[in-house]
UniProtKB/Swiss-Prot annotation:
It is found in: Cytoplasm; Nucleus. It comes from Homo sapiens (Human). GO terms for cellular component: cytoplasm; nuclear body; nucleoplasm; nucleus. This is Cyclin-D1-binding protein 1. Belongs to the CCNDBP1 family. It holds the Pfam family GCIP_N. InterPro entries: GCIP-like, GCIP-like_N, GCIP_C. The gene is CCNDBP1.
Amino acid sequence: MASATAPAAAVPTLASPLEQLRHLAEELRLLLPRVRVGEAQETTEEFNREMFWRRLNEAAVTVSREATTLTIVFSQLPLPSPQETQKFCEQVHAAIKAFIAVYYLLPKDQGITLRKLVRGATLDIVDGMAQLMEVLSVTPTQSPENNDLISYNSVWVACQQMPQIPRDNKAAALLMLTKNVDFVKDAHEEMEQAVEECDPYSGLLNDTEENNSDNHNHEDDVLGFPSNQDLYWSEDDQELIIPCLALVRASKACLKKIRMLVAENGKKDQVAQLDDIVDISDEISPSVDDLALSIYPPMCHLTVRINSAKLVSVLKKALEITKASHVTPQPEDSWIPLLINAIDHCMNRIKELTQSELEL
C-alpha cells in the first residue's frame, strides 16, 4: 500500500504593496481611539522627566525617519516588492507603537493639561502617518502632484514640534491660557469690526451683488439678495450689542489677568490647581463664540440673553477658582470684585434690554 504524501504547507501570499499600505493605514487609525482614552501606565518607579522627554524625542525622530524612507521608495517606480513592502510596513508600525508606548509613561500626577498636550501631539503623529499611507497607496500616475510630500510634511512637522511641547504643567497651563486669550481677542475684534461697519455681512453681500448684478429680478428681492432687512441690525439690536461687547471685553480681561497670575505665582508642583484653572478657562472661549454668533442678524434677543448668562456664569466660576488657588495671594485679589461688578453691570443692562422678550 503506497504511503500518502503529506501536502506541502501553503505559502501565504502577500498582498500587493499598495494594498499593504492601505491595510497599514487602517491599522494606524484603529490606534487613535485607544490613544484618546488610554490611561498612563502604572509603575512603582519614580518618574524621570529628563529620561521621558529624551525617549519621546528619540521616538519622534524614528517616526520621522520612517516617514521619509517610505515617501522616497513609494513616490517613484518601480514600487518595492511585496516582501520589501512588508518590511517597510512593519518598521512604520513598530515606530508608531513605540512612540505611543512612551506617551503612556507620562503619569497623571504630572498634570492633566500637560498630558493632554502630549496626547494631542501623539494623535497628530499617528493620524499624519495614516494619511501618508493612504496617499502613497494611490499609484503614482493617479496621485496628485506633491500630495504625498504634503502628507509626509505633516508627519514631519508633528515630529519636529515635539521638542517645543512644554515640559511641565505650569508651562502647559500658560500655553493653553495664551491660546484662550488669543481666541477671545479674535472674537472681540471681529465683533467690533462688524459693529463699526454697521454691516455684519458686508463681504457676503458684496459678492452676492456682483454675482447677481446682471440678472437681478423680483425673485432676488423675495429671497433677500441684497435687500432683506434680516441681514441688518435694528436700532434695538445695536443698543443690545453695546453691553455684549463690554462683556466680551471683560472676558478678555479676565483671561489675561488669570494668565498673568499663573505666570507670576504659579507653582509647578500645584498641578491639580493649575488643571482646574485651565479647565474652567477653556470654557470661556466657546461661551464667547456662542454670544458672538448670536448677535448676528436676524438677532434673537432671548438667545443673546441666554448666551450672555452662560458666559457670565463661566466667568464667575473662573474667577472663583482662581481666587481660591495658590496663584492669587490675598493682597492681590482686589481686582476680582471690580471685574465681577463690571460683569454684573453688563448682564443687568442686557436683562433690561431683553426684558420685553420674556413678557411676550
